[in-house]
Design a protein with these regions (language model features):
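Short helix-capping/linker turns of helical repeat alpha-solenoids
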Residues: 29-33, 46-53, 62-64, 69, ...
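Bacterial N-terminal signal peptides
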Residues: 7-15
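Positively charged n-region of N-terminal signal peptides that target proteins for export
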Residues: 1-4
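Terminal, low-structured helical/coil segments at or just beyond the last alpha-helical repeat
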Residues: 159-204
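Sec/Tat signal peptide C-region and signal peptidase I cleavage site
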Residues: 16-20
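Hydrophobic face of amphipathic alpha-helices that form TPR/SEL1-like repeat modules
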Residues: 21-28, 43-44, 55-62, 91-98, ...
């Protein structure tokens, strides 16, 4: 079984309606003024703003403006994740997968990746695709679902998903490809992702 590697990739995705302090904090972060970012973001995170929680978690994860602290990073990302922040859900999934600051738990990783993927998060979709392709974390091997997920991530410009899809197609029948394409077309963000296909089980 090929080892699945998951890169922690963060996209802030801040909403235009975010309060001024959050926008100022994000701007300061992007300008690498981490002290100002911390000042603006921390009160909002403590007040329960999911975007601020995610950004503060990122600062702890990267050690920007604060000492690097993976437990704090997990804590803040978890607060955002349970509020439905897809970026944070992906991070929580990755931390469970790697056992970073928490006991390694691949089943929990799958749950959090799926939550993010069902919101259209391309990194989470790609991570799930690899799990379906390589039968990781107790996932059934299903090349059709893997291809579908790569399709969805590729539509958002995920380069690794594009490469993975090109590799997958070499293992698939035309019937499997057709099913995967149809599933991709019919799925809408915010709806459950399929957990199995008619033709995609097994494979090399």
């Amino acid at each position: 079984m090929r080892k699945l590697t998951v890169a922690i990739l963060f996209a802030l995705g801040l909403h235009g309606s975010a309060m001024a302090g959050l926008a100022e904090g994000a701007n300061a972060y992007n300008a690498r003024n981490y002290a100002l970012a911390l000042k603006e973001i921390t009160p909002l995170a403590k007040a329960g703003n999911a975007d601020a929680e995610h950004l503060l978690g990122l600062m702890y994860y990267m050690g920007r403006g604060v000492p690097r602290d993976y437990k704090q990073a997990f804590s803040w990302h978890y607060k955002a994740a349970v509020q439905g922040k897809a970026d944070a859900q992906y991070v929580i999934g990755a931390m469970y997968y790697t056992g970073n600051a928490v006991p390694q738990d691949q089943k929990l990783a799958v749950q959090w990746f799926r939550k993010a993927a069902e919101q259209g998060h391309p990194d989470a979709q790609h991570a799930l695709a690899l799990m379906y392709r390589y039968h990781v974390a107790g996932m059934p091997q299903d090349l059709v679902i893997a291809y579908m997920l790569c399709n969805l991530a590729a539509a958002n410009g995920h380069r690794n998903a594009i490469e993975q899809r090109a590799s997958l197609v070499k293992q698939m029948t035309q019937e499997q490809i057709d099913e995967a394409q149809a599933m991709s077309r019919n799925w809408k963000p915010g709806t459950p992702l399929p957990t199995s296909s008619h033709t995609g089980g097994g494979g090399s």
